[in-house]
Amino acid sequence: ISGLALVLWVHAVYGDESGAVWEKLAPKILTVTKDWSASYGLFTDGEADMVLSYTTSPAYHMFAEEDFNKKAAIFPEGHYFMVETVGKIANTDQPELADAFMAYVMSRDFQKMIPTANWSLPSALPQADWPEGWSDLPLPDKVLFYSEAEAAEVQAEAIETWRNALSQ
């Protein structure tokens, strides 16, 4: 998950109050890393109490490591929508192969691998068919999402608000 998603989430939830929210959070922020792996490593090494990660991150620790101490924070305001996509390039010179690959990605066999191969939720598999224990994971009741146009419209302001608050 990206820091930009967090900045957009704070903007979506708090709007004009975003600066005050960032100022309140600033003393609690250990560091801002260049990527998810660096920050998650600080968390798993015990150097940080919390980390910005995926709602499904605890699943890896639960099912792969039998570590039930890591939890997702579920916010009543909702979570910023994060999706990984796959697509067919319009001018591909192999449209049949692209269609076959897309069909495979959407197939039940592929979708059943997503939870424990990518540690994320499958998009085309009913919850009743998720692996054992996955339906018990806490999930947000609400998602927040900016369209591409909306995100482009607020991104510069949201980043500037974040930068100003954290540089105080």
Indicate residue ranges for each PLM-predicted region.
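Solvent-exposed loop/turn segments at secondary-structure junctions
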Residues: 1-2, 56-59, 78-80, 93, ...
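Extracytoplasmic ligand-binding site segments that recognize negatively charged/polar headgroups
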Residues: 1-48, 61
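Extracellular/periplasmic bilobal clamshell ligand-binding domains
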Residues: 131-168
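Periplasmic-binding protein-like
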Residues: 22-26, 32-33, 65-90, 104-128
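A bilobed periplasmic-binding-protein/Venus flytrap-type ligand-binding module shared by bacterial periplasmic
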Residues: 11-12, 82-95, 113-117
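A ligand-binding cleft/hinge motif common to bilobed small-molecule-binding domains
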Residues: 44, 48-69, 118
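Short amphipathic alpha-helical coupling segments at ligand-binding clamshell hinges
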Residues: 21, 93-105, 113-114
